[in-house]
Amino acid sequence: MFFVNFFIILPVVTFVHEAGHVLVARLFGGRIKFSIGTGKKIFDIGPLEIRKRYFMEGWCQYDKLSYNKTWAHVSIYLAGSLFNLILILLINYLILTDVLPKSLIFRQFVYFSFYFIFFSLMPYKNDDGKPSDGMAIYDVIRYGKAEDPID
């Protein structure tokens, strides 16, 4: 089960999170690029690149927003966690209505999604100096400085 969680569920949760940033950045007219994983790039699919250690993390980079306002940047930074939360609620609803089985896989998916929400909204910079979503929100509200790329 560990391998399923680490090599399948966690990358899917990461993809959902990054897709939230991507969708909202596109809604504001931004050009985007996003990545799943770290290390050497394996391949690209449009703006998505998959890296060697695809199960480790993800990031999103955007520029040229049509609406280059503080609220637009905050919306983009919050969108990853919002997508994770929407999926948590959807999965729980589908389990409660017996559409999905009460499976450990779905519980792990919800767990990893909560993990992503918690740590992405906590304000910090990682070892590479990239800001968490929470730090990016803090910086854009306090200093008017949009961060790029974001985790």
Model regions and ranges:
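Cytosolic juxtamembrane regulatory segments of multi-pass membrane proteins
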Residues: 44-45, 141-151
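Alpha-helical transmembrane segments of multi-pass membrane proteins
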Residues: 10-14, 112-120
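Juxtamembrane/interfacial segments flanking transmembrane helices
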Residues: 31-32, 118-143
